[in-house]
Amino acid sequence: LRLARNLISEGATVYVIVQDKNDGIRDDKYLECDTDEKAMGTYEMPISQKKRLRQGMQYVNQLYLKHKLEGIQNQWMISIHIDSQPEESRQDVFFYYQSESKKSKKKAKKLQEVFSEKYEKYQGRDYNGSVSSRPLFVMRASDPEPVYVELANIRNQKDRERIILPQNRQILADWLMEGFLK
C-alpha cells in the first residue's frame, strides 16, 4: 500500500488487486491478520490459492487491456511477497522477472541496482539480493510487464525487522518507487 501511495503521488494509476477495507497503511509493529480481503475491494476471493491467483490475474489482465485500448503503453504488474523459508535462511530483497521479457528483466535489474546502492549507503554492507527469472504463475499469466518482489523471510528475525518496523516498510516502498522511476 505504501508503494501504491508513492506511485500515485508521482501521477501513476495504481490498482491494488487484493484489498481489505479495514486494513490500510498502518504504523503498528505487528499487523493483525484477518480474512476479509476482497478482490478489487468488492469480489469474494476463493479459498484455493490457485483460484485466487487466477482471479487476481484476470483482473490484472482486464485492466491492462482496458488501458491498452486507451493508448496507455507503460503498464506494470508488481507482485510483492514475503517468503517463509527455514528460520536460519536470511535473504535480502530479491526480484524475479518474466523470462521472455527484456523490459521485465531490465526493470528487475534497475530495482536491484537501487537496493544495492541503498544498502551500501545506509547499511554499510554488500547487498546480496538476486535477480532471476522464475516460471511462477503470476509471471507467466501477466499481460502487463511483471516484476515479482520478495521482501523478506518472515521466519528470520533480521528479515522480520525489515518488515515489522513501520519506517522500514516506508523505506522499502521508497526504494521500490525509485527503482520504478529510473
Task: Kindly give the residue locations of the regions a language model identified.
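A short, glycine/acidic-enriched catalytic loop
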Residues: 83-114
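Catalytic-core regions of hydrolytic enzymes
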Residues: 1-89, 97
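Sec-exported extracytoplasmic/periplasmic mature domains
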Residues: 4-12, 61-68, 112-121, 168, ...
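Short, Lys/Arg-enriched charge-dense amphipathic segments
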Residues: 36-46, 65, 99-103, 144-159
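Extracytoplasmic/secreted envelope proteins and their assembly/folding machinery
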Residues: 1-4, 53-57, 61, 92, ...
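Extracellular structured ligand-interaction cores
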Residues: 75-77, 92, 144-146
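Active-site-adjacent mobile loop/cap segments within catalytic or ligand-binding domains
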Residues: 83-86, 96-97, 121-182
